Amino acid sequence: MTDKHNEEGKEKKLKLPSKMIIGKHVDSKKFKTSYFTSHNNSVTVEIKGGRKFSSSSSLPHKINTQISTIDEFNEKISLLKKAASFAKSEEYRSNVTNFSSTVEVTEQQTEAENSTNINLSEQTIKNNSHQSSSNTIETTQEKKQNDDLSSNITPVEAITQLEPNQKILQNQQNSSSISLNSIISKPQNKSSIENNVEFETEATSTKSSAIWTKKNNSAKPKKSDIYQMLDSDSKSKTRSFAAIKRARDKEKRKLQNNALTKKIYREVIIPDTITVNELALRMSEKLSDVMQALLKLGIKANINQSIDVDTAELIAISLGHSVKRTQDSDVENILHSDKDTQDSLLPRAPIITVMGHVDHGKTCLLDALRSTDVISTEAGGITQHIGAYKVNLPNNKSITFIDTPGHEAFSEIRTRGAKVTDIVVLVIAANDGIKPQTIEAINHAKAAKVPILVAINKIDAPDANPDKVKNALLAHNIVPEDLGGETLVVPISALKKINLDKLEEAILLLADMLELKANPNALASGTVIESQVDHKSGVIATILVQRGTLKIGDILIAGNGFGKVKRMINDKNQQVNYAYPSDPVKILGLSQIPNAGDAVAVVQNEKQARSIVDYRIRKAKEEQDLKVHNISLEELLKQASANQFKELSLILKTDVHGSLEAIVASINKIVNDEVKIKILHAAVGVINESDIILANASNATILGFNVKIDSTASIKAERNKTNIKYYSIIYDLIDYVKSAVSGMLSPIIHEEYTGRAEVRAVFNITKVGKIAGCYVTKGYIQRNSKVKLLRNNEVIFSGPLQTLKRFKEHTKEVKEGFECGIELANYYDINVGDIIEAFIVTEEKAKL
């Protein structure tokens, strides 16, 4: 048979050689070298590291292949095996001695299946791992023995992938040629690498056999052998798989880097306040770019500094991002999400706050109502803590009383008492009248829009004058009922329990008019009345339940702390499991001591509590950061001048938070131009070792109010001689601070004028200097006097005298009408006509 026209357009026949080699080297993990050898009229197909196939009668083949993957190469080997199997068939062997066959191979160059004849050549192997393969198979068979390979060999081009399911050989009976067709796809581009595998077999009529052997694959050929290509007249070297793979990886990285460098614009969620670092992370921008944008707005900030939402929005927009505002405070909405319906509201006990001036009988009144003796337990006989009590009345009704201190230092406590109350009972002593704290209580009640009920106490006193008190109330827009107004006024005596029943009736009447109701089935909420730290029980908070029912095990938020309610104790020191609206109770279980006046609320779970507390802490920090950032120039100058002041360092420890707050407020009112009071640490609890360490390091004084010192701290304080002061009455503590500040003040200097002298002559004395000859015109001049030298009514010197002489003798005093010699200390610019005034300096201890 003849092949189709080759590239020159001519017909060409190929002779069957005695030996056929399949390729030179195949670069894959599985196939290292593939070739055929002739053994005694048999053909052996040997694939190193793979398998061996032998046949006594086979068909000469030549395969040009471009291999992309190992699987595609395996398909080529499968094709060769099928060709060899056909060579063993009876039909082929019957005709093999009398004919020569040519297997024509076509190369598809276009999609319209145009073909050309391709001459057989020695194999050239090239491999491209990311492009499709092409194959051309051309076989020629002619019976001949021991012939060499034809030297007329040219490269084979554009061979495509073979499909394994198509027939490879077709048997044509009574014909002198056999055609092997392959499926050929489109030609590859110029960058494709051709892999040519030459397959030649020796055709004999002997019986065929298949031999499979395993070859040792341990020897790995060198790259120079594996990738060596054969050309018609010279050898050349191509790139290795590793090099191609590195090049492809480099290209991929380049594409990825280009994708990364392409800026992505985002929708940035910005809360009320945000740090510079967090803003940069949310925008995926460099910190340097964000800082530069801030500088353009005239803002100098570090990465941890907080900026407001408006500034953050300007930065985000300037960098090309869109902005979506959100509020972190949304987490607290769960505390107010449920609303009470009218049907869920039930009557509750009124909450009464007792207010008035100190020593007007507020606590004594509560003792009389509760039949207790609280006042005897108060230091100095005055109330220094806010207290809450529940009084059960004979008619199965109850009233909750809140007792507030009357001392001026406890203004904040009275303010809180007015805010949580329903009715203010203003206690005024009939023998003392309206005082400053009485007026303050009236103002607090009016500010809180709380009705006032006046109780004129001590009507049993000899000098009591209730009518005078009623008339004095008119000056503060409080008009009693008997004077035509709406304010209930009840004269009482707490000490002798006079008219206490009338006071209770007036309270209940006013409460009925207010229609006080609450929902007992809701989640509990209320207000912190007082808080403290106990060395055995931990944090204890006195709270007033204003809504819902508080139970043991509830998750409670109080200020910046939260916790599970472990125990509840009522005002009678009894442990209870439930607290209903208007009930005051002490609770244990909070993680952090709350401030008096903080709101408390029960939440569903610990996760909600933690998110709310984290928000509150973060908000407080951001507000502090903004406060520091927005400090004015005047404040900076004030701080700079404050550094020149003397400093009194204090550490304050109290039993409850209300007392701590009152003492700090009172100390801050002690202001002067020389001494600055610095409270290094103020907390609730006993004096501990860390307080001692801080006091020693800063030379501070520890002030303890109704607290003690623990044993470890006591030993350390005694060893280091730490200054610790203990007080149980707020008056004494404030007086000590004032005294300490006064002791640090510079004494007051007084100049007492004593006399005047006129300079009438100046004498230059060797080794002494200038001596002024003076005449005392007024008063007297003493040796220890301070003098001022005046010239043209201007002071040119002020200082002590060096010597005072009368003639040549030293003297202590020279009186008016006498002459004397005066030498000034280290000053010699004295002229005739100058005036010397003498005065005595006296010091007086400064007081606040």
Swiss-Prot record:
InterPro entries: EF-G-like_DII, IF2_II, IF2_N, P-loop_NTPase, Small_GTP-bd, T_Tr_GTP-bd_dom, TF_IF2_bacterial-like, TIF_IF2. Residues 381-385 are annotated as: G2. It is found in: Cytoplasm. Residues 106-150 are annotated as: Disordered. Residues 356-363 are annotated as: G1. Keywords: Cytoplasm, GTP-binding, Initiation factor, Nucleotide-binding, Protein biosynthesis. Residues 347-517 form the tr-type G domain. It comes from the Bacteria. Belongs to the TRAFAC class translation factor GTPase superfamily. Classic translation factor GTPase family. IF-2 subfamily. This is Translation initiation factor IF-2. It comes from Orientia tsutsugamushi (strain Boryong) (Rickettsia tsutsugamushi). The lineage of its organism: Bacteria, Pseudomonadati, Pseudomonadota, Alphaproteobacteria, Rickettsiales. The gene is infB.
